[in-house]
């Protein structure tokens, strides 16, 4: 079967991508690790001894980076609807975060109000239609935010992928009502044509 022009272009861009090459050279599972690293370098989000949850973790770039920063201490739980190869000192849940039984499995692992940091790089399968994709993406952000409000300890932090579009301003407003500091970041590793950004919320207020 012949590849479409768009898929050929994507593959060419992918293999020419400086972050893809860097990830391969440095032993990381995905280029996405550099999005988290850039933000963490500025904000010092991840430290040894923390309790951290990583949503939308597969193939494991963010989890891999967090595990390295935590140096085998604390607790790191990763969750994804797709399988992920094991990583040192990481507990992995295979399941759909939108399903109640999967959410409960995660809650059972993390005592309430002990979570230091919630990471979420979750995104829906993209259809190419903003009218479909943005609401799906915002729903995942809302679920992550609800989980954070239930589980974060006072002063805890959250970093979630969020797409510009309908509902964006309302979610930012909601975050500002619950956290001391809220900023929007677009790391240099994010593709320029992508609508993705990252909402960083620090200092959770009960």
Curated annotation (Swiss-Prot):
Keywords: Cytoplasm, Methyltransferase, rRNA processing, S-adenosyl-L-methionine, Transferase
EC class name: transferase
Binding of S-adenosyl-L-methionine, residues: 60, 62, 80, 96, 121
Pfam families in the cross-refs: FtsJ
Residues annotated as the enzyme's active site: 161 (proton acceptor)
UniProt main location, coarse: cytoplasm
Location relative to the cell: Cytoplasm
Function summary: Specifically methylates the uridine in position 2552 of 23S rRNA at the 2'-O position of the ribose in the fully assembled 50S ribosomal subunit.
E.C. numbers: 2.1.1.166
Species, as recorded: Legionella pneumophila subsp. pneumophila (strain Philadelphia 1 / ATCC 33152 / DSM 7513)
Protein name in UniProt: Ribosomal RNA large subunit methyltransferase E
């Amino acid at each position: 079967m012949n590849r479409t022009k768009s898929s050929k272009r994507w593959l060419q861009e992918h293999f020419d991508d400086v972050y893809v090459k860097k990830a391969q050279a440095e032993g990381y599972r995905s280029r996405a690790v550099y999005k988290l690293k850039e933000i963490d370098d500025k904000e010092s989000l991840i430290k040894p001894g923390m309790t951290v949850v990583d949503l939308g973790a597969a193939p494991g770039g963010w989890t891999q980076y967090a595990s390295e920063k935590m140096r085998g201490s604390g607790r790191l739980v990763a969750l994804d609807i797709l399988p992920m190869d094991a990583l040192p000192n990481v507990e992995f849940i295979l399941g759909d975060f939108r399903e109640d039984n999967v959410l409960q499995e995660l809650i059972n692992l993390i005592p309430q109000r002990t979570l230091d940091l919630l990471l979420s790089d979750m995104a829906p399968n993209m259809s190419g239609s903003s009218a479909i994709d943005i609401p799906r993406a915002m729903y995942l952000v809302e679920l992550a935010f609800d989980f954070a409000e239930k589980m974060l300890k006072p002063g805890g932090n959250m970093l979630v992928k969020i797409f510009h579009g309908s509902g964006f301003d309302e979610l930012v407003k909601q975050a500002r009502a619950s956290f001391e500091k809220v900023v929007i970041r677009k790391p240099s590793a994010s593709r320029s044509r992508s609508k993705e950004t990252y909402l960083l919320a620090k200092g959770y207020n009960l």
